[in-house]
């Protein structure tokens, strides 16, 4: 057994193996398990990616069509030098539209598939993330789209939902841009936004709303994120 702990000898004796002391004075590796548990963000680079994943704070962007989610997600990920989990639904749609004679409308199973892959992608990218992980969307957002299309929540999608540490609702006060897959119906868009607020309130999950241009949104989002998650001086501000 290799340890840097004083109790290593007793532990090795208990399980009947040889103990090899390594770097008792922490000259080579200036960190310990006790130090990491006390402030994991201060010693982020010393943790294995699997361990880091446990401590990652997940920030998810929400909003109806053309509210600047993707642009803001990329900007926040760049600001914090962390990962941006992309929107799998868009990838799925673009591939789906290339299939000859593909159905014109999605079916509920498509949204379950999208939510599942989105969640799996998040789990994988947590290991690549910094202390804060930015998500363009998540399974909860997919559930809101399921409600928009079918006026009900899908229990299969519900089982995939993992509440985020913070949800950011992007406002509709920016010019609408049609990219071929968005629905330019003001009543539907407004209903989607209102349902987003209602559900976050009902579930008691933390959220903030953003309005204004991109620069204002970045400033307000980073201020809120840093106040919530990065206020401890031990957490590196990588911007």
Name these PLM-found stretches.
Residues 1-57, 62:
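Classical nucleotidyltransferase
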Residues 69:
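Conserved lysine of the Walker
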Residues 74, 78-123, 221:
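Conserved substrate/cofactor phosphate-moiety recognition/catalytic segment
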Residues 112-162:
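Glycine-rich phosphate-binding loop used to anchor ATP phosphates in small-molecule kinases
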């Amino acid at each position: 057994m290799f340890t840097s702990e004083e109790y290593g000898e007793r532990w090795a004796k208990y399980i009947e193996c040889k103990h090899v002391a390594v770097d008792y004075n922490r000259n080579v590796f200036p960190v310990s398990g006790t130090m990491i548990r006390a402030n994991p963000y201060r010693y982020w680079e010393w943790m294995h990616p699997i361990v880091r994943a446990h401590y990652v704070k997940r920030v998810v962007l929400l909003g109806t069509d053309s509210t600047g989610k993707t642009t803001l997600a990329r900007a926040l990920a760049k600001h914090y030098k962390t990962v941006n989990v992309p929107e799998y639904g868009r990838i799925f749609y673009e591939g789906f539209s290339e299939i000859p004679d593909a159905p014109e409308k999605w079916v509920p199973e498509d949204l379950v598939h999208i939510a599942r892959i989105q969640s799996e992608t998040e789990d994988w990218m947590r290991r690549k993330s910094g202390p804060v992980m930015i998500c363009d969307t998540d399974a909860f957002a997919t559930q809101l789209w399921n409600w928009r299309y079918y006026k009900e929540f899908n229990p299969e999608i519900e089982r995939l939902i993992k509440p985020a540490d913070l949800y950011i609702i992007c406002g509709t006060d920016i010019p609408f841009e049609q990219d071929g897959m968005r629905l330019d119906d003001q009543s539907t868009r407004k209903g989607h936004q209102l349902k987003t607020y209602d559900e976050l309130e009902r579930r008691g999950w933390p959220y903030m709303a953003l309005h204004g241009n991109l620069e204002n949104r970045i400033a307000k989002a980073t201020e809120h994120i840093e106040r919530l998650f990065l206020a401890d001086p031990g957490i590196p501000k990588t911007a």
